[in-house]
Each structure stands twice: as structure tokens, then as C-alpha cells.
């Protein structure tokens, strides 16, 4: 189970393969999102795959792995322990452009994982605004937010922030912009991303 033998290491959550057409980025994200309310997300190994393999098996599927950037696939695993579930020798040259994102992530990974990581926003469906909040201290933490394939460039996302709080959000990774906001009812904050299938990681501070 999820709560036994944790002293021996992280949990390998699942097998997913493009060969079998059972790897969809939003499925992986949804599993992590749903479990994170009950299981420490930072203890789960979460896979991202070689999106250039087996593209023909997915046909015109709008949620096929190759329709996402490699950076986004990696980002879906960041609340857990990212697991590169592929043979690196088979990656095309363009895949190695992800190195910059990985190096920046490694600088905040430890601090991000020190907090209590909980789901925020909508359940991942391939069409949602979703994400995670890491509550590091009473006044600060992280917000990892994803805009899936939907037409809403901005929306209100429910978080675990206290209603009425004044919050400063500083972008760390992805395409977020510096944001000062007042938390609304049910912990909602207004967020925006101009592109579909994109993400942003903020460090927030309650003033």
C-alpha cells in the first residue's frame, strides 16, 4: 500500500507505455493530483515518457503525448519525484533542450518538497485549470499551476490560501508573470496563461 515501508524509499506508482497507448500526460497528472490529498506527493515517482515514440498509434487523439511540449510533460511530474521512463539514447536532439528547465527545477525541488503538497483547481481532465500548492510555512510556499487544453486564458483557481489575504506571487519556472493579488472566497486567486498546455511555478508570500 501507499503507507507501508516508506522508510525504504519512494513509491513507483505505475507502468505507462506509448507502445500500449496507455500514457496520457493528463492521466498521470490526474493520478498524482487525486493521490496528493492523502499521500505525500513527494514520495511518489511520477513518469514522463519519450513523446516522439509511437506517435502513429495515437492517430488524431488531441491528448496524445506528442501534442505537448517535452517541458510540459516534465512539469506534470514536478510535485512528485520526476521519473524519466525511457531510454535517453533514443531521444532526438531537440529533447535535450529540457536541460535548462531541469536545472532550474533542481534548485527549488528540495524546498518545494519540504511543504505539504495538496491539490488545487479542477481535477485534471485534459481541459482543466489545475495544479498543486506546497504549504511550506504559514506565510509562504509554492503554487504549481497548469492550463490544460481549454479556451480560458484566465480563470479563478481554488487554493488553500486564506480568504482576504494579500499575496505576492513570484514566477520561478514556466510562463507566469509577477502577480500581486487578494485571495477571494474559498481561497480563489485569478491566474492567467496565454497558451494552452502550459504551466507556471510561483513562490508565494502572504503579506
State each model region's role:
Residues 187-189:
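Short strand-edge motifs at loop-to-beta-strand transitions and within beta-strands
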Residues 1-180, 193-195, 199-203:
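Active-site-proximal substrate-binding groove within the catalytic cores of carbohydrate-active enzymes
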Amino acid at each position: 500500500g501507499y503507507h507501508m515501508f516508506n522508510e525504504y524509499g519512494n513509491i513507483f506508482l505505475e507502468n505507462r507505455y506509448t507502445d500500449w497507448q496507455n500514457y496520457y500526460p493528463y492521466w498521470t497528472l490526474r493520478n498524482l493530483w487525486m493521490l496528493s490529498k492523502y499521500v505525500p506527493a513527494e514520495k511518489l515517482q511520477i513518469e514522463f515518457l519519450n513523446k516522439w515514440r509511437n506517435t502513429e498509434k495515437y492517430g488524431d487523439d488531441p491528448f496524445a503525448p506528442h501534442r505537448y511540449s517535452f517541458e510540459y510533460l516534465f512539469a506534470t511530474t514536478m510535485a512528485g519525484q520526476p521519473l524519466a521512463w525511457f531510454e535517453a539514447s533514443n531521444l532526438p536532439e531537440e529533447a535535450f533542450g529540457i536541460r535548462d528547465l531541469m536545472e532550474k527545477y533542481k534548485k527549488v525541488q528540495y524546498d518545494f518538497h519540504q511543504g505539504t503538497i495538496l491539490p488545487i483547481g479542477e481535477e485534471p481532465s485534459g481541459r482543466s485549470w489545475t495544479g498543486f500548492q506546497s504549504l511550506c510555512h504559514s506565510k509562504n510556499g509554492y503554487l504549481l499551476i497548469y492550463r490544460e487544453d481549454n479556451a480560458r486564458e484566465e480563470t479563478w483557481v481554488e487554493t488553500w490560501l486564506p480568504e482576504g489575504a494579500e499575496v505576492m506571487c513570484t514566477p520561478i519556472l514556466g510562463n507566469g508573470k509577477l502577480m500581486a493579488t487578494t485571495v477571494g472566497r474559498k481561497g480563489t486567486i485569478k491566474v492567467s496563461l496565454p497558451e494552452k498546455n502550459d504551466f507556471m511555478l510561483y513562490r508565494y508570500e502572504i503579506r
